[in-house]
Amino acid sequence: MLFRSLTGDPRGKDEARHFGIKFNVKPLTRENYKQVLEPLIGKGDFLLNLSVEVSSVDLIEFCVRRGAMYLDTCIEPWLGGYYDTSISASRRSNYGLREEVVALRRKYPNGSTVIPTHGANPGLISHWVKQGLINLSRDILKRAAKPESRQDWAKLAMQLEVKTIHCSERDTQVANPGKRRLEFVNTWSVDGFVGEGSQPCELGWGTHEKHFPRDGKQHKFGCKSAIFLTRPGASVRVRSWTPGEGSFHGFLITHGEAISISDYFTVRSGKKVMYRPTCHYAYHPCDNTVLSLHEYAGKNWQLPENKRILMDEVYEGADELGALLCGHEKGAYWYGSRLTIHEARKLAPFNNATSLQVAAGVMAGVVWAMENPLRGVCDPDDVDYQRALELANPYL
């Protein structure tokens, strides 16, 4: 098995050399991606896309046409796509980008396996939701039978009266040195976080909701499982909970799982929606990143030149990430990963707690895709949750 790394900048060069992986700095653009990738990608190959500002939709179609498998951790447009005002906010939202991928699912129903969003969240969060529902079913309904279809899963969530699903995350990792003035730090991709934090806030919108946000907007196309607000997610706070932190205020950052999970667990009678849970991300990053966000917002959303991913500098803390299922008979139930920096370093080199959770989700998705190479375009919710967790759990 041959591994090649194609990247837009030299970060990660030393790690690639350590593992004997060929490392090439060649940024992909709308103009050159076919020319660059055609010599590298053929039938049976696997393209793992962990970049930003590279169109997931274009790369997916490229791979399917060549019989190659594909996995991404989020659906990205080309550089500038998030801010292209010639396209409506609805069309360039995560909801709109997902609908473009859904169109490819219909276009290539029996193509090579493509999982456009499978890291930790989106990705593992979908499997934690399902395991959480099984556990609640055992406790509340006194049965733990695994649903056999998407419709069965949705009916189980409705029967349990789950109203809201949070992707709830609290990062308590601490680094030395910490954030400096005019520097943006984070425990994972600064560019990735800033990109999604600057996008309009998006959330799956449940049937139990009795009001509508003043700045809320509905989509006029697609599955209509989600809404968006006319302000950046990094400016919106929501209350959530994790076992170690307890209650906290997190940022309602747009994420693919908010849209796909609310869609997956929708119950319909004909064209009428009978049940759908509200679903959103509630993210409290590490405290140094919160300081970075405050500075970023205060500078009118202008990103400083200095950016740093906190990796070797982290000396304590953990990342708690999981599914918080709310509204049922038990009130609320959280199921997920509580990974400390010390555990992460014992499990895998060159990682912190956050990056290892993502890497575990990526690895599980890649293995499942290779075991099921002709499934077409799949949401994480379409992946076998038991197999995915079996693969990922040793690293969580």
Q: What is each of the regions a protein language model found here?
A:
Residues 135-396:
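C-terminal catalytic/substrate-binding lobe primarily of soluble NAD(P)-dependent oxidoreductases
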Residues 25-42, 55:
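Conserved Rossmann-fold cofactor-binding substructure of NAD(P)-dependent oxidoreductases
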Residues 88-161, 361, 366:
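Adenosine-phosphate binding glycine-rich loop
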